[in-house]
């Protein structure tokens, strides 16, 4: 299509650079104008003018809203002249496509919008897109890959598998709302990533050809704080961790099943790990694209532990008890059965302790 291409449909004319209107007669004319404008989904101004339904894309549904308000007052009045008319339609068509995303100052963009082959849950994809933040980024300083976890509401707590029930500290189940998006490491922190920052390797599983890409372990909650302060990262809260692990599922395991044998596809655990850790990312990701949320190594989260906390937990952005003797661990590990890799299972340890099946995953604010 040339830079200046004209399509004429009765009293409706459309140029590549602008549209003019003698009268508005049919939706087919509008569609033809859109075609003449070659309106493909591309990033645009951050203001996202014309996105009337808030899904971060200016497209057919927004056009329908605007036409439904024709010659009336409404959100479709994009130029603010008091009436929805042809000028507003021209603005919308000129802004057609995806809204631009915000890339955090600490990050390097990899992919702006969620890949449906990775973020397989359509509700999560829509929530990520609606956030206005880039989906997949690298932390520039560490080159660690991070994925956006959108805000959302979920039921936190006990989900039984076909073979195992819950323990008391997984109850009562309760609704939790996370109001802010955050970034989560796509993988557990590896031995190499730890060594680059901390100049030593505490891990038990060194000396293998893939050791650099195995999760770092033998790291205490207390020691991890030095790594976090040097990188600007943080540990996820327990609620953030479970929301990210579940990735829209309500089943025992984050693959959408409560059938214990299916764990083999998503987790390194006692029956398939061969008494050792494995390189991160070797098992299937969950519906947010996060790997090893179940199995491989336990993951420290930020919260103190209190077995009765779920009974008094705030429903919005819970951060755990204000004090305690133990910190929470999540996700199970290579040493444990399917019971422990359930999305709701909670374990604990003293913050100064280390074990060869305990590691961590980072989070970061946008």
Predicted feature residues:
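Alpha-helical segments with a strong preference for the paired helices of cellulosomal dockerin domains
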Residues: 52-73, 81-101, 192-195, 222
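Proline-centered structural pivot motif
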Residues: 65-73, 91-101, 202-205, 262, ...
């Amino acid at each position: 299509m040339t830079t200046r291409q004209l399509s004429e449909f009765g009293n409706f004319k459309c140029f590549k650079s602008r549209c003019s209107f003698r009268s508005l007669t049919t939706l087919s004319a509008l569609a033809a104008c859109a075609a003449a404008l070659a309106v493909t989904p591309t990033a645009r101004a951050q203001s996202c003018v014309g996105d009337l339904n808030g899904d971060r894309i200016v497209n057919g549904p927004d056009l329908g809203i605007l036409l439904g308000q024709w010659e009336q007052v409404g959100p479709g009045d994009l130029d603010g002249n008091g009436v929805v008319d042809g000028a507003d339609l021209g603005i919308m068509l000129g802004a057609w496509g995806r809204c631009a995303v915000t890339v955090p100052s600490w990050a390097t963009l990899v992919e702006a919008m969620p890949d449906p082959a990775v973020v397989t849950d359509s509700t999560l994809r829509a929530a990520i897109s609606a956030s206005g933040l880039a989906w997949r980024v690298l932390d520039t300083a560490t080159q660690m890959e991070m994925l956006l976890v959108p805000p959302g509401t979920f039921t936190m707590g006990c989900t039984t598998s076909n073979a195992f029930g819950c323990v008391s500290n997984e109850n009562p189940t309760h609704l939790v709302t996370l109001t802010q998006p955050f970034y989560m490491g796509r993988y557990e922190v590896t031995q190499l990533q730890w060594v680059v920052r901390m100049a030593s390797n505490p891990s038990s599983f060194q000396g293998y050809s893939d050791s650099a890409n195995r999760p770092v372990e033998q790291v205490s909650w207390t020691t991890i704080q030095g790594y976090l302060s040097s990188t600007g990262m943080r540990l996820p809260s327990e609620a953030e961790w479970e929301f990210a692990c579940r990735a829209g599922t309500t089943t025992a395991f984050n693959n959408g099943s409560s059938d214990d044998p299916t764990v083999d596809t998503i987790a390194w655990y006692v029956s398939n790990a061969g008494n050792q850790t494995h390189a991160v990312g070797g098992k299937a990701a969950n519906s947010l694209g996060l790997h090893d949320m179940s199995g491989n190594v336990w993951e420290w989260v930020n919260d103190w532990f209190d077995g009765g906390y779920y009974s008094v937990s705030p429903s919005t952005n819970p951060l755990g008890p204000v004090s305690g003797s133990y910190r929470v661990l999540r996700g199970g590990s290579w040493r444990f059965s399917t019971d422990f890799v359930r999305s709701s299972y909670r374990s604990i340890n003293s913050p100064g302790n280390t074990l060869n099946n305990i590691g961590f995953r980072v989070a970061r604010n946008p």
